[in-house]
């Protein structure tokens, strides 16, 4: 009798695991793109002057990538995702020819949103490889300030005028329970950005300038994914 009960429980577990990528189920998760902290100092000298320029500072950055999607057919989920990141830095600079020092601060939050499609290859109870395509439009704006010990200061604000990226990601998800998985992925993305900067000094006349650039990068993610059974499923 005990063997029969155990067999039924094992069969139910396998069926649940195999059903987590079925049509009507939901996919909810979050990935950690990167976390970094840097502490640095530097000295720069030139051949045409005895002055030595010094600087020291630190920076911190973090990015998160939550997502939600619905399985429109077995193993294929369609939905959307966001990428949220924050960068903060602070530095101090001086030189040996002057007693003046300058403190600089920079804050840059970023927010991207867009659609995604993920396809799982198979539905093993242990895990599944997957491929994901995504496209996102970005909204990011930051501010930097510079203050000297002599009393002068300046502020620069950034305003995005067009920022987007798209790409393909390949990964593997390992199921730690029938409905919860840990995943790792690596991809290839391409994007373009256009940003306007507003420079405003405490004295003198300010000005605006615009920069445009394109980028190719390789995103690496690890995170947690939850598979929620569709309505009426147990």
Residue ranges and their predicted role:
Residues 41-43, 87-91, 174-234:
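Predominantly the C-terminal beta-signal and adjacent terminal strand-loop region
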Residues 1-23, 232:
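Bacterial Sec-dependent N-terminal signal peptides
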Residues 39-50, 90-101, 113, 141-155, ...:
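Outer-membrane beta-barrel translocator domains and adjoining extracellular loop/strand segments
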Residues 30-34, 64-72, 82-84, 115-119, ...:
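Residues on the lipid-exposed face of transmembrane beta-strands in outer-membrane beta-barrel proteins
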Residues 24, 58-62, 107-113, 127, ...:
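Residues that define the transmembrane beta-barrel architecture of outer-membrane proteins
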Residues 47-120, 124:
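Glycine- and aromatic-enriched membrane insertion/assembly motifs of diderm outer-membrane
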Residues 20-70, 78, 221-234:
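Short glycine/proline- and aromatic-enriched beta-strand/turn motifs that initiate or cap beta-hairpins
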Residues 23, 73, 122-126, 175-177, ...:
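Outer-membrane beta-barrel channels and translocator barrels
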């Amino acid at each position: 009798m005990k063997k029969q009960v155990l067999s039924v429980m094992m069969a139910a577990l396998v069926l649940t695991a195999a059903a987590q990528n079925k049509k009507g189920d939901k996919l909810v998760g979050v990935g950690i793109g990167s976390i970094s902290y840097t502490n640095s100092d530097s000295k720069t000298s030139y051949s045409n002057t005895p002055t030595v320029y010094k600087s020291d500072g630190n920076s911190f950055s973090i990015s998160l990538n939550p997502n939600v999607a619905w399985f429109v057919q077995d193993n294929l989920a369609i939905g959307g995702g966001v990428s949220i990141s924050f960068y903060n830095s602070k530095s101090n600079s001086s030189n040996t020819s002057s007693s003046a020092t300058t403190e600089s601060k920079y804050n840059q939050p970023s927010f991207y949103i867009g659609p995604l499609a993920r396809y799982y290859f198979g539905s093993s109870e242990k895990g599944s490889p997957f491929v994901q395509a995504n496209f996102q439009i970005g909204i990011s704006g930051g501010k930097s300030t510079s203050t000297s010990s002599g009393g002068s200061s300046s502020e620069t604000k950034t305003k995005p005028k067009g920022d987007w990226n798209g790409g393909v990601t390949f990964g593997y998800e390992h199921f730690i329970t029938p409905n919860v998985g840990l995943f790792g992925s690596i991809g290839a993305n391409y994007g373009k950005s256009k940003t306007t900067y507003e420079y405003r000094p405490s004295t003198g006349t300010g000005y605006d300038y615009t920069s445009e650039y394109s980028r190719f990068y390789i995103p690496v993610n690890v995170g947690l994914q939850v598979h929620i059974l569709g309505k009426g499923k147990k």
